[in-house]
């Protein structure tokens, strides 16, 4: 049996591609363009696992396919290399995070190159390179100039163990940090914010024009959270104070029986009575220990404290008590709500807990038993009585505006983006704070502001970053003698990844972010492949920065990514005991087809689970490439199932993919290759070309591979293989298994040239038409035989063929034939006595 030597072939062709710059991006503007982008990786110490190449293989297949179709293809790779893990490692070990990051990048790059991806490495970028982050800082200075980057004293999600504040999006539902799983507490701090809220409406509207999964668009819509309603102003009894609430249901104002302020609301300390001061102070402290997510969890027990103060309901003059409760957030809306417990579940539970009034203002339901949250005609509502929801809202908004106690309002759930981190390993923020109280951004000719090299990267202990320890770097003096201090916060990891797709277009430009003509040529990204976990972080931030750059006239498109595709997750094999607890794979042995815990001898259930180091079920692509070859890994990951499905890794599936490639190798190298076409494979070959082409366009890679298998099966049944069909088949294979395809292309052509830019095969529509067709022969409606006949045979010919058939003759012998019914291209039915 002949097998191909994957190590020799893959090493040979990877060297050829590198030596010949095979995948250098074409610049001829006469050709159509195709920009295929991967979400660039964070280069962790663990290196690649087999989940990474799934998305990378998909974009590589599309890139190779499009090159063969005559497109200029931009297919780059780089490194999202700032971030907490490298800094944490450096603090734990005393190593420089830059050195650690460089080692990790070298490992990732070696692994990625071993998989044969057709990246243009001349365009490689690294977010920690000062030549790159010069432009990250430049974008920040432009945001600052336009008032979209500002400082504010805000309650932040502080993580003591990380020594930094993190964004709302980085807090898990259990109130711990996404990175590290550490406790998160609320703490007021001076922070840099980016005014993403200024773009809320455009971020929402422009989703309609994108070819993205609807689930991702919905997640962004929900995160932006547009609400239409009204602001209502409540006066505080016996004071000059007032507060504003936003409500989507101003029509229920007659049912507002109490108000709730966030514990952090500015009014709380002003209006709290002496008798309630201690209870309020204690409650505020407890609230500060909880994350926003923990505070707003619908399932948690309702807590709160009365301030001792009352507000006046503007629509009926009634006094209503003012409470504080942690489920109201200072950062959301106005930090105050009017509570209508008859028609809101959370308000109803709170009112029941603290024995507050519940007044129904909509017909229907029994508010003594539960809140009524459906619609109904208005009751107990003065001038709104008898009106439906829409009419009542309109009438109430008109009344509020006429009386000067409210107005129509659109709000968004989206908060401004907390942009500063109290860490060392990030882009320095290019701002100087002067002793006269002013602040200035560095001019472009002073960028990049380079991150100083230091071993002293432990948190400062003051809430500032370790940069506060570096006096020589920190302190500056202006020409007029005024002293200043550099900003010590650094940018979050999201900064460099919010625009990296633009730098790939012109990565070596030291005069501007990228050349305008090149940006016009390549934008938008045609297909962006990556994980769905980035729906409301990276993807929203990148869209915001892109729209800002569009407003500046830097980029020519409103949106960065035209098509988004989320690949599924490759799951590892895991084992569970009778309690459902996961058991690490090194504690499992297989006996007689079953799996047992080595330590307890308990039989275990096998189940797929996310690959993790703790379960020891992470598959390293290096091992797969060594044993099976890169082409096998590529074909297997694409053949596992639909690209967007999450599927368990299978060694048997890997072996099956390798066997298929060995069959391809044997077919081409051992079958007689004929210069003349005998026509036997016309139909199957043309069908395969047509179908594979369609499935590649639709990113249905698993079914495209199935078609390749169909051709191999059909070709193996023939004595010889027509040369043009052999070559065409290898071209179809090339995007999936490029090393083997290059080797077999040379075997067939002896050209000495790569297959990369050979024109994609076409198919002959006329060859897809069936010349012959199978019909059934029946006696009294029951099938007795099947025969292949010429397509569109006449009734007379079909009758003759049926009566000449051996099986039919045996059945009708000695019997009278009453009639013969022939239906062209379908059947012949013989009726006998």
From Swiss-Prot:
Cross-referenced HAMAP family: Leu_tRNA_synth_B
SUPFAM superfamilies: Anticodon-binding domain of a subclass of class I aminoacyl-tRNA synthetases (SSF47323), Nucleotidylyl transferase (SSF52374), ValRS/IleRS/LeuRS editing domain (SSF50677)
Disulfide pattern: none
Keyword Transmembrane helix: no
Protein name as catalogued: Leucine--tRNA ligase
Listed GO MF terms: aminoacyl-tRNA deacylase activity; ATP binding; leucine-tRNA ligase activity
Compartments, record wording: Cytoplasm
Record carries keyword Amino-acid biosynthesis: no
Catalytic activity: tRNA(Leu) + L-leucine + ATP = L-leucyl-tRNA(Leu) + AMP + diphosphate
Chain span(s) of sequence motif 'KMSKS' region: 610-614
GO cellular component, one term: cytosol
Amino acids binding ATP: 613
Family affiliation: Belongs to the class-I aminoacyl-tRNA synthetase family.
Residue interval(s) of motif 'HIGH' region: 41-52
Annotated GO biological process: leucyl-tRNA aminoacylation
């Amino acid at each position: 049996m002949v097998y191909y030597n994957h190590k020799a072939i893959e090493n040979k062709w990877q060297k050829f591609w590198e030596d010949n710059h095979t995948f250098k991006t074409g610049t001829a503007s006469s050709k159509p363009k195709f920009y295929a982008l991967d979400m660039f990786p964070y280069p962790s110490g663990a290196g690649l696992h087999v989940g990474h190449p799934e998305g990378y293989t998909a974009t590589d297949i599309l890139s190779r396919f499009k090159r063969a179709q005559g497109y200029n293809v931009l297919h780059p790779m780089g490194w999202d290399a700032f971030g907490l893990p490298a800094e944490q490692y450096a603090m734990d070990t005393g190593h420089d995070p830059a050195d650690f990051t460089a080692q990790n990048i070298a490992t990732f790059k070696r692994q990625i190159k071993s998989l044969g991806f057709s990246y243009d490495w001349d365009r490689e970028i690294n977010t920690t390179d000062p030549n790159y982050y010069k432009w990250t800082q430049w974008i920040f200075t432009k945001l600052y100039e336009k008032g979209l980057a500002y400082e504010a004293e805000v309650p932040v999600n502080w993580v003591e163990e990380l020594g930094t504040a993190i964004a709302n999006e980085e807090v898990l539902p259990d109130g711990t940090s996404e990175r590290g799983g550490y406790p998160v507490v609320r703490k007021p701090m001076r922070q840099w914010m980016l005014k993403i809220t200024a773009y809320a409406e455009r971020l929402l509207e422009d989703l309609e024009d994108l070819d993205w999964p609807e689930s991702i668009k919905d997640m962004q819509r929900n995160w932006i959270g547009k609400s239409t309603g009204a602001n209502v102003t409540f006066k505080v009894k016996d004071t000059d104070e007032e507060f504003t609430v936003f409500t989507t249901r101003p029509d229920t104002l007659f049912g507002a029986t109490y108000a709730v302020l966030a514990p952090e609301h500015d009014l709380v300390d002003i209006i709290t009575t002496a008798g309630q001061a201690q209870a309020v102070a204690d409650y505020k402290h407890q609230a500060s220990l909880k994350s926003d997510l923990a505070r707003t969890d619908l399932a948690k027990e309702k807590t709160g404290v009365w301030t001792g103060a009352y507000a006046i309901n503007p629509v009926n003059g009634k006094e209503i008590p003012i409470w504080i409760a942690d489920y109201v957030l200072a950062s959301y809306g106005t930090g105050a709500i009017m509570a209508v417990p008859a028609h809101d579940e959370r308000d109803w539970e709170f009112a029941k807990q603290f024995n507050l009034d519940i007044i129904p203002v909509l017909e229907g339901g029994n508010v003594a038993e539960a809140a009524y949250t459906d619609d109904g005609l208005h009751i107990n509502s003065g001038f709104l009585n008898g009106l439906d929801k829409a009419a009542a809202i309109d009438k109430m908004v008109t009344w509020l505006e006429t009386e000067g106690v409210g107005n129509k309002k659109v709000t968004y759930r989206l908060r401004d983006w907390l942009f500063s981190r109290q860490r060392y390993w990030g882009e320095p923020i290019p701002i100087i704070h002067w002793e006269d109280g002013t602040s200035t951004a560095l001019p472009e000719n002073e960028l990049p502001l380079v991150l100083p090299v230091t071993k002293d990267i432990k948190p400062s202990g003051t809430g500032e970053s370790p940069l506060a320890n570096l006096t020589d770097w920190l302190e500056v003096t202006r020409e007029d003698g005024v002293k200043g201090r550099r900003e010590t916060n650094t940018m979050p990891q999201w900064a460099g990844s919010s625009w990296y797709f633009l730098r790939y277009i012109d990565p070596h430009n030291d005069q501007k972010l990228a050349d305008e003509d090149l940006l016009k040529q390549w934008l938008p990204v045609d297909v962006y492949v990556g994980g769905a976990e980035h729906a409301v972080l990276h993807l929203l931030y990148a869209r915001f920065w892109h729209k800002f750059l569009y407003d500046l006239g830097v980029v020519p498109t409103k949106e960065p990514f035209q098509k988004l595709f989320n690949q599924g997750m490759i799951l590892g094999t895991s084992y569970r005991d009778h309690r459902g607890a996961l058991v690490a794979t090194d504690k499992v042995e297989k006996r007689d087809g079953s799996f047992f815990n080595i330590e307890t001898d308990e039989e275990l259930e096998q189940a797929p689970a996310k690959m993790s180091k703790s379960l020891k079920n992470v598959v390293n692509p290096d091992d797969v490439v060594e044993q099976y070859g890169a082409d096998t890994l590529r074909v297997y990951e694409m053949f596992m199932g639909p690209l967007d499905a999450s599927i368990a890794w299978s060694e048997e599936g890997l072996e099956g993919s390798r066997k298929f490639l060995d069959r391809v190798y044997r077919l081409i190298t051992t079958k007689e290759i004929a210069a003349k076409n005998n026509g036997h494979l016309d139909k199957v070959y043309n069908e395969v070309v047509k179908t594979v082409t369609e499935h590649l366009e639709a990113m249905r890679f698993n079914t495209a591979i199935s078609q390749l298998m169909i051709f191999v099966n059909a070709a193996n049944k023939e004595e010889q293989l027509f040369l043009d069909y052999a070559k065409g088949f290898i071209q179809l294979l090339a995007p999936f298994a490029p090393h083997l395809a290059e080797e077999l292309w040379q075997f067939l052509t002896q050209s000495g040239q790569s297959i990369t830019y050979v024109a994609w095969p076409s198919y002959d529509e006329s060859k897809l038409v069936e010349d012959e067709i199978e019909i059934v022969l029946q006696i009294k409606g029951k099938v007795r035989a099947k025969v292949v006949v010429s397509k569109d045979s006449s009734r007379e010919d079909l009758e003759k063929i049926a009566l000449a058939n051996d099986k039919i003759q045996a059945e009708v012998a000695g019997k009278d034939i009453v009639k013969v019914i022939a239906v062209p291209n379908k059947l012949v039915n013989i009726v006998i006595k």
